[in-house]
A protein has these predicted regions:
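Transmembrane alpha-helix segments characteristic
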Residues: 179, 307-310, 319-339, 383, ...
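Membrane-interface transmembrane helices that cradle and orient dolichyl/undecaprenyl
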Residues: 117-119, 158-174
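Hydrophobic, aromatic-rich transmembrane alpha-helices
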Residues: 295, 300-321, 477
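Short helix- or helix-capping micro-motifs
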Residues: 128-133, 160, 181, 185
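C-terminal luminal/periplasmic domains and tails of membrane-associated envelope-modifying transferases
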Residues: 405-731
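Signature aromatic-anchored transmembrane alpha helix within multi-pass, membrane-resident enzymes
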Residues: 1, 225-230, 313-332, 359, ...
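Interfacial juxtamembrane loops and adjacent helix segments
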Residues: 37-100, 243-285
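Short hydrophobic alpha-helices at membrane interfaces in multi-pass membrane enzymes
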Residues: 129, 166-182, 214, 330-331
Length: 731
């Protein structure tokens, strides 16, 4: 048990927030703090609730219930605000929450050991323990704040106690089976599958003198169901009310659970074909019936597969298929459910099958007498098995979630087979930062498959189109997939194969598929250094509005020996002069020089003003000229929306006394190069009641995400704006 917990605990410190962790932690913690289950939508709150227990004693944690996302029950945005934007120590919170999941994992290991001893024998118990403590899928999910491990534990416990009831008809066993079935349903909506397992086991398990009769089996299903309902009702604070898909006069216990169970089923059906998934080299919006069969073949350790197969063959040979149906029925049922092609996004959905496969494999220890009758042979066999398991899992440690067996080939081939949570779940930002530091990489262009904030882990980056965090915005639309700008790129395996999981973006990163990574972060993020031969010429087209991946390469001026550094504009209110070519405003008699350098990100060269004065009610029209500097725009955490904007204010002396203001920026930073000049047209509406006199014009640069302004040096001091001139308001 200590070996298992150590592997999970040690590797947990090396992992950033995986894709779903922030959702479950936010929902569970908010439930504990407020008793409100409004965030328990896509999943019931039990898993997150258990994980959040270690956080209750921490009075420094801020729960932002005053944010609009809480009022709107928006778990996606609220979890972002909670973890990354409320001043909370996100990684520390996650590590403490993961302790509880690891504790559940240890309980699962112990349960498998004792179940094997009870069902099969002492030798089987020890073999099951050996197989379990080095099972990479169980180790991986025993240190993520998600629903998969709790669901696996509770389904296993429910099935085990149900088997005990069928073999030794004691009503408390049926009651316990029902309680654990209720916990499985409280952990995840598909926990309802446990009832199919229990019902089929009751039908197949032979009746014995000491076991439950047919009549008792039927009655016990009702008892177990009532126990499960009691668990769910307790979890939802004994609430009673109507649901939308039934008559309003019919109240139900735990209506929130029932309603969202129904909504989730409808949503899964509606989402079929709505996003692109990946399987065996094919990115498609269709599903594959054999997805989980292949996934099991490459994601489970070969020894585990081999022993499970031998175990099943021996069950058939010994005519024990019905007597020990509990060993093979749950995996078979889960695989058949997977063949319905409902959800092809990760082998983790088969995690509840693994404990039963381990029992099936462990049964071999009781059925091969020549191996177990002599202590010396037993010791040698155990030693060889242990060595095999240790060496196998050591190949990927501490990256257990990315485990593939030897059938999958070297790690470079794994993303050709499966991606998403099979390999890449957003968990390797810590590794990415360390790889960047080790290789002296200052910043990367990042295509990240995950919901964590890369900035929170010290990753310096510019966002590329990615599911789900970076799906839109000018920086995303400005990505040139045909000849990306030179520099370092960090591409998640899922993004490499599926883009942003929409049909039109599947090949966003096709150019990188034929390149060998310079380095990797874990097994999920690949680093490439992109450079072009010195003889390559550069086209510098200007594109307004259209996402670059929707345009053919020829439209961007790309040819075999010519790449494109595209200047992307959101509207026609701005103009770009690539490398300053064609910029002649300084020769205009109305040009007013400024030369204010904002942190070497942008320099305000000056502006033109063709209006000598303006009257109240009129619009003052200016054109500002900015030149791109050597430094990138600082990125706050998390990156959401525009990275940069500029302001122009008309003020009456004090900068806080604004009479008119302009805040906007049209150009994407991606594709801009040092020396590019951007001409931005500015319109300032002067109100009717403005008194005639001279007013100051101020300009500056800021981040719309955290409202931080860049500073500029003036007369030996630094300011977050520059006075560019004055405007005369006349009667």
């Amino acid at each position: 048990l200590l070996i298992f917990a150590t592997q999970a605990g040690w590797s947990s410190t090396r992992k950033s927030a995986a894709f779903d962790e922030q959702y479950h932690l936010a929902a569970g913690y908010s439930y504990l703090r407020t008793g409100d289950f409004r965030l328990a939508t896509n999943h019931p709150p039990l898993a997150g609730l258990l994980a959040a227990l270690p956080l209750l004693a921490d009075s420094t944690i801020t729960l932002p219930t005053d944010h609009s996302s809480w009022q709107n029950s928006d778990r996606f945005l609220f979890s972002d605000i909670f973890l990354w934007e409320s001043g909370n120590a996100a990684q520390s919170m996650l590590l403490r929450a993961r302790w509880m999941v690891t504790a559940l994992g240890v309980l699962l290991v112990a349960s498998i050991f004792f179940a094997a001893r009870q069902m099969l024998g002492v030798r089987a118990g020890w073999l099951a323990l050996l197989l379990t403590i080095f099972e990479p899928n169980l180790i991986a999910h025993s240190r993520f704040v998600t629903t998969d491990l709790p669901l696996t534990l509770f389904i296993f416990l429910a099935t085990w106690w149900w088997w005990r009831w069928l073999v030794h008809a004691r009503w408390r066993y049926a009651m316990l089976a029902g309680l654990f079935a209720g916990l499985a349903m409280g952990a995840k909506y598909n926990g309802a599958l446990v009832w199919a397992i229990l019902a089929l086991t009751a039908l197949l398990q032979p009746i014995t003198p000491a076991g439950a009769s047919w009549k008792q089996r039927l009655a016990s299903m009702i008892v177990a169901a009532l126990a499960a309902v009691a668990v769910i009702w307790t979890l939802f604070r004994f609430s009673v009310g109507p649901v939308t898909f039934l008559p309003a006069w019919l109240p139900l216990p735990a209506p929130h659970y029932v309603q969202w169970f129904w909504n989730t089923v409808v949503r899964i059906i509606d989402l079929q074909g709505a996003r692109v998934d990946f399987f065996l080299g094919e990115a498609s919006s269709r599903s594959w019936w054999n997805y989980f069969f292949v996934a099991a073949g490459v994601k489970l350790p070969l020894l585990e597969l081999l022993l499970a197969l031998i175990g099943f063959v021996l069950l058939v040979r010994d005519r024990s298929v019905r007597r020990l149906c509990v060993l093979w029925l749950p995996p078979a049922l889960l695989l058949l459910l997977g063949a319905t092609q409902v959800l092809n996004i990760g082998f983790r959905h088969m995690l509840p099958a693994i404990p039963f496969l381990l029992l099936l494999g462990a049964s071999v220890a009781e059925r091969v007498p020549w191996l177990t009758t002599r202590p010396r042979r037993t010791a040698i066999a155990a030693g060889l098995l242990a060595l095999w398991l240790v060496l196998d899992v050591a190949r990927v440690a501490p990256h257990y979630e990315s485990y593939f067996n030897q059938l999958a080939g070297p790690w470079q081939n794994w993303s050709n087979l499966l991606v998403d949570s099979n390999l890449d779940w957003g968990q390797d930002l810590i590794e990415l930062r360390q790889v960047m530091d080790a290789n002296g990489i200052e910043s990367v262009n990042l295509a990240y498959f995950g919901k964590a904030a890369p900035e929170a882990y010290g990753v310096r980056y510019q966002p590329l189109p990615s599911y789900l965090r970076f799906m839109e915005g000018r920086e995303i639309y400005a990505y040139n997939p045909y000849t990306p700008m030179p520099g370092w790129y960090a591409i998640s395996a899922t993004a490499l194969r599926t883009g942003t999981m929409t049909p039109e973006t599947v090949d966003l990163y096709k150019v990188f598929r034929d390149l060998a990574p310079e380095a990797r972060a874990g097994f999920s993020i690949y680093l490439y250094h992109l450079a072009y031969p010195p003889t390559t010429t550069v086209a510098r087209p200007i594109v307004t509005g259209a996402a670059l991946w929707t345009l053919p390469p020829a439209a961007l001026g790309i040819a075999p020996d010519r790449r494109a550094a595209v200047k992307w504009l959101e509207t026609s209110a701005s103009t770009v002069y690539p490398q300053g070519a064609g910029f002649t405003a300084t020769r205009d008699e109305n040009f007013q020089p400024v030369a204010a350098n904002f942190a070497d990100v942008l320099t305000l060269l000056g502006y033109t003003n063709n209006m000598q004065s303006v009257k109240p009610g009129e619009t003052l029209a200016l054109t500002l000229y900015w030149q791109v500097g050597e430094q990138p725009m600082p990125q706050p955490a998390p990156t959401r929306g525009a990275a940069l904007s500029i302001f122009v204010h008309v003020v009456d002396g004090d900068p806080a006394r604004k009479l008119a203001e302009f805040d906007s920026w049209d150009a994407a930073l991606r594709g801009l190069e040092p020396g590019d000049v951007i001409a931005q047209h500015v319109a300032l509406e002067i109100a009717e009641d403005v008194a005639p006199k001279a007013y100051d014009l101020l300009a500056g640069v800021y981040s719309p995400q955290d409202w931080q302004r860049l500073v500029t040096a003036q007369d030996g001091a630094t300011y977050d704006y520059v006075r560019i001139g004055a405007v005369e308001v006349t009667p």
